[in-house]
Curated annotation (Swiss-Prot):
Family: Belongs to the Casparian strip membrane proteins (CASP) family.
Organism field: Ginkgo biloba (Ginkgo)
Transmembrane in keyword set: yes
Coiled-coil region: none
GO CC terms in record: plasma membrane
Record topological domains on the Cytoplasmic side: 1-37, 91-104, 176-178
Keyword Secreted carried by entry: no
Protein name (database record): CASP-like protein 5B1
Membrane disposition: Multi-pass membrane protein
Signal sequence interval, chain numbering: none
Pfam family, one: CASP_dom
Subcellular location: Cell membrane
Length: 178
């Protein structure tokens, strides 16, 4: 549904006289977190900052190239960084020219791109966390490796995935309501 009844969700100071003329319909065009809003920009900035942190933390480890899960995390977070940075620039541009990003073709591109990057990010974060738990709890390699660094990188990847998941759901909601 694309509208809200002011009796249920009052906006401003409406008198009973206004309601006798017929129901007032208030459109919900800009919900927080939608593309082209301040909330959407904040989500995108958080996504690319956490992705960048995951990359930097992982790459500064000595032996990350020896393990496929760690290399996959760097690749997935690089894609996440590029996607979120590009959309943050687009959100900034939309805010500067005061135009919304409600084109259905554009929204469908955002939804599919968010789903792909969210899936890759979650897979990378889970595989990195799994390998790190294996090294720490089962193989006792953490005395020889930088396990805490890898755990922190996985945590940053999970935070980036959480933000892109929120952004993906909000964009899908907007796209489905068009």
């Amino acid at each position: 549904m694309d509208a809200s009844n002011p009796i249920v969700h009052p906006i401003g100071d409406h008198h009973a006289v206004d309601l006798e003329e017929g129901p007032l319909i208030v459109t919900m065009k800009e919900l927080p977190g939608m593309p082209g809003t301040i909330g959407g920009l904040a989500l995108r900035v958080g996504q690319f900052l956490f992705a960048a942190a995951a990359i930097v933390i992982m790459v500064t480890g000595d032996e990350f190239t020896n393990y496929t899960a760690f290399c996959y995390l760097v690749a997935a977070m690089s894609l996440q960084f590029l996607w979120s940075f590009m959309l943050a620039i687009l959100d900034t541009y939309a805010l500067l020219i005061k135009r919304g990003l409600r084109n259905s073709v554009l929204l469908s591109l955002f939804v599919v791109g968010d789903w792909v990057t969210a899936t890759l990010s979650l897979a990378a974060a889970c595989s990195t966390a799994g390998v790190t738990v294996l090294f720490d709890n089962d193989l006792n390699y953490c005395g020889q490796m930088h396990c805490h660094r890898y755990q922190l990188s996985a945590a940053m990847a999970f935070l980036s995935w959480l933000l892109i998941g929120m952004s993906s759901l909000l964009t899908f909601w907007l796209w489905a309501s068009e």
